[in-house]
């Protein structure tokens, strides 16, 4: 549990530095692209999982 706290703290610090440093405007487009790629990969994974007939617990 402590590991998760440290991980999210580091992520929050990096996001704060980038957000207040003016880099946020440039990274919004990259974040959008990564978001849509993640959605596509999720959908492909779901379709392949359903096609194979596996049940996930």
Swiss-Prot record:
Keyword terms of this UniProt record: Cell membrane, Membrane, Transmembrane, Transmembrane helix
InterPro entries: DUF1328
Recorded superkingdom: Bacteria
Membrane-spanning residues: 1-21, 30-50
Family statement: Belongs to the UPF0391 family.
Protein name: UPF0391 membrane protein BRADO5617
Pfam family name, one: DUF1328
């Amino acid at each position: 549990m402590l590991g998760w706290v440290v991980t999210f703290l580091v992520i929050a610090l990096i996001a704060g530095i980038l957000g207040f440093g003016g880099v946020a405007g440039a990274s919004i487009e990259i974040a959008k692209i990564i978001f849509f790629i993640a959605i596509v990969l999720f959908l492909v994974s779901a379709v392949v999982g359903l096609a194979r007939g596996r049940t996930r617990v």
